[in-house]
């Protein structure tokens, strides 16, 4: 029986490249001359910390980072950007988490979405991925289109497609 896996992964190497590129853009921006502004990647915790002197500049840095991520093929929805910024002395900062893997709640939403669509396939939650099996390739491709078109707030990849 044909099957495939629905996963949500980010290549940390591409994230590192995006952060380095954003720092390069930051160093050439005229409005950030003489301003203490830093974008740092913590690969262990899978977070990006942005620090600068004002709230407005913080939003500008986030826009620079998002632009760099999109150029590197990382979707905006894979960044979990907090609404409130932290204020320490004269510095403002935000810690952006990278969304890796599919949490159980999201996996249940995907399973419910597929079951409600009445496509003749079975779904199984396997850790941080969802396996979809069906009798025909067309059913599996319909599930791929269904999940892509659903606004679930997280990017998904479809791999391990087997006949």
Curated annotation (Swiss-Prot):
InterPro entries (UniProt xref): DUF520, UPF0234-like_C, UPF0234_N, YajQ-like_sf
Presence of keyword Cell inner membrane: no
Source taxon at top rank: Bacteria
GO molecular function, one term: nucleotide binding
SUPFAM superfamilies reported in the protein's UniProt record: YajQ-like
One GO term describing the cellular component: cytosol
NCBIfam families per record: PRK05412.1
Notes on the domains: Composed of two domains with a four-stranded antiparallel beta-sheet flanked on one side by two alpha-helices.
Function: Nucleotide-binding protein.
PANTHER family: UPF0234 PROTEIN YAJQ
Quaternary structure annotation from Swiss-Prot or TrEMBL: Homotetramer.
Name this polypeptide is given: Nucleotide-binding protein YajQ
Organism whose genome encodes this protein: Haemophilus influenzae (strain ATCC 51907 / DSM 11121 / KW20 / Rd)
Lineage of source species: Bacteria, Pseudomonadati, Pseudomonadota, Gammaproteobacteria, Pasteurellales
């Amino acid at each position: 029986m044909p099957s495939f896996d629905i996963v949500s992964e980010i290549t940390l190497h591409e994230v590192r490249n995006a952060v380095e590129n954003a720092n390069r853009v930051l160093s050439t921006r005229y409005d950030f001359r003489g301003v203490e502004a830093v974008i740092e990647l913590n690969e262990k915790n899978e977070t990006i910390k942005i620090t600068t002197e004002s709230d407005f500049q913080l939003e500008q840095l986030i826009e620079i980072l998002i632009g760099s991520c999109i150029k590197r093929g990382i979707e905006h929805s894979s960044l979990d950007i907090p609404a409130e910024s932290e204020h320490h002395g004269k510095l403002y900062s935000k810690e952006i988490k990278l969304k890796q893997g599919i949490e159980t709640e999201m996996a249940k939403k995907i399973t419910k979405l597929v079951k409600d669509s009445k496509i003749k396939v079975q779904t199984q939650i396997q850790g941080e991925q969802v396996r979809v099996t069906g009798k025909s390739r067309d059913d599996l491709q319909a599930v791929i289109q269904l999940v892509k078109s659903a606004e679930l707030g997280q990017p998904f990849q479809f791999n391990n497609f087997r006949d």
